[in-house]
UniProtKB/Swiss-Prot annotation:
Induction of expression: Repressed by fur in the presence of iron.
Residue stretches spanning the membrane: 9-29, 61-81, 89-109, 114-134, 143-163, 179-199, 233-253, 267-287, 294-314
Name listed for the protein in its UniProt record: Probable heme-iron transport system permease protein IsdF
Location in the cell: Cell membrane
Family membership: Belongs to the binding-protein-dependent transport system permease family. FecCD subfamily.
Role: Part of the binding-protein-dependent transport system for heme-iron. Responsible for the translocation of the substrate across the membrane.
Keyword annotations from UniProtKB, A to Z: Cell membrane, Iron, Membrane, Transmembrane, Transmembrane helix, Transport
Topology in the lipid bilayer: Multi-pass membrane protein
A Pfam family recorded for this sequence: FecCD
GO terms for cellular component: plasma membrane
InterPro entries membership: ABC_BtuC-like (IPR037294), ABC_transptr_permease_BtuC (IPR000522)
Amino acid sequence: MMIKNKKKLLFLCLLVILIATAYISFVTGTIKLSFNDLFTKFTTGSNEAVDSIIDLRLPRILIALMVGAMLAVSGALLQAALQNPLAEANIIGVSSGALIMRALCMLFIPQLYFYLPLLSFIGGLIPFLIIILLHSKFRFNAVSMILVGVALFVLLNGVLEILTQNPLMKIPQGLTMKIWSDVYILAVSALLGLILTLLLSPKLNLLNLDDIQARSIGFNIDRYRWLTGLLAVFLASATVAIVGQLAFLGIIVHVVRKLVGGNYRVLIPFSTVIGAWLLLVADLLGRVIQPPLEIPANAILMIVGGPMLIYLICQSQRNRI
């Protein structure tokens, strides 16, 4: 009971930190906002300067929150489905496949913009299915699976590089220049994906069982591995449709697991909040380090995530010895 109360208190503290960070991000920028500016806006409803800043910053903040949460949860689901603590949508090529499909859809069927998350999901499925098929045949260990994923990532990014030589082929570049329609599109995918994840979370702990143990209790482990993997790909692909590729947010789950343990009923909510906070901080730092220039949030995530991935690979190899 005491441990549960501590986790609840920690979760509330993280929520407060997330809200505080969102407020700081909202009032910070080339044009700063004061509390009085916001108070005047919400009491009188008339402040054109604040209105313009709201339309610039608030969609960006909301998208950062949703994308961070979705990618962190996607990482947790992928790791559960593949039984690999190194799995992450960007590393295994899922994001690259989704981005290629997104680019092709915008070139040939731009009128389906609202359906981009679903269409990108189809592209993200291809590298995921390749990983699954190869793993079923060769039984990769954790590091070998990631190496195959990196090879797919490089291959698909090469294809993407060729496609983007076409001046009409536009791909999203991070969190900049986001508008309210992007928020609405992503919100639908976020609500659907995260609600399904919460419904699925009681079964995720059972994915750690081997096939014999699962069958002995009547648990269809193959079905739930597929459902979990598909949901992970959907969450990651939906974010790619709006912001493009963001690296390493999925492996933050390893840190969350150290904090709260491996119970997915607890791990998923904590990953949601910490993932949202991490991307929001990365975006905020990118805006304030060298104004008026902006450092992409993805660059900051790569600087932090690269050493973390090296550490996880070394730890995985040490555990095999």
